[in-house]
C-alpha cells in the first residue's frame, strides 16, 4: 500500500514539474509565421489600397523575436505577449526612406501596439488603441 502511494506521489510530482516547464509562448504558437498587412483603422473606418497591401510583412518566431519589412525598410526585434496584451519591446529598422504617409502611419501604429487578436487563425489584428488596429493576413 505504501509503495502504491509512493508511486502515485511520484507520478503526480512528475506531472506538476512537466507542466511548469511549458511557457505560454510555447502553447500559443498561433502567432508564429508570416503575416502581411492589408490595412488599418477600425470596423467602421478601414483604410486599404495598393499603397498598403503587401507593403508590410512580419514573421513572428518562437522565443519572442520577429523580422520582416515595412517597405522599403527591413525590420527585426523582439515582442512580448501575455494573454491578449502585446508589445514590441525592441524594433530595429534600416532607414532607406521613401515611405509614403500610409506606410509611416502603419509603422507608427505597429510601434504603438498594446494588444492583439487572432481571428479564424488567418487574421491578425494589432491594436494600437481600444478600437483601432493594423490588420494582417497569414501568409504561411
Predicted regions: what is each one?
Residues 1-20:
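Sec-dependent bacterial lipoprotein signal peptides
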Residues 8, 20-140:
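Lipid interaction determinants
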Amino acid at each position: 500500500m505504501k509503495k502504491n502511494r509512493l508511486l502515485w506521489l511520484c507520478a503526480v510530482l512528475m506531472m506538476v514539474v512537466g507542466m511548469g516547464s511549458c511557457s505560454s509562448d510555447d502553447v500559443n504558437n498561433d502567432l508564429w509565421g508570416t503575416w502581411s498587412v492589408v490595412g488599418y483603422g477600425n470596423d467602421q473606418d478601414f483604410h486599404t489600397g495598393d499603397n498598403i497591401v503587401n507593403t508590410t510583412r512580419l514573421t513572428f518566431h518562437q522565443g519572442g523575436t520577429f523580422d520582416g519589412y515595412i517597405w522599403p525598410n527591413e525590420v527585426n526585434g523582439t515582442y512580448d505577449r501575455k494573454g491578449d496584451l502585446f508589445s514590441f519591446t525592441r524594433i530595429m529598422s534600416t532607414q532607406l526612406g521613401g515611405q509614403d504617409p500610409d506606410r509611416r502611419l502603419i509603422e507608427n501604429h505597429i510601434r504603438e501596439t498594446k494588444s492583439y487578436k487572432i481571428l479564424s487563425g488567418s487574421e491578425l489584428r494589432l491594436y494600437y488603441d481600444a478600437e483601432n488596429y493594423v490588420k494582417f493576413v497569414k501568409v504561411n
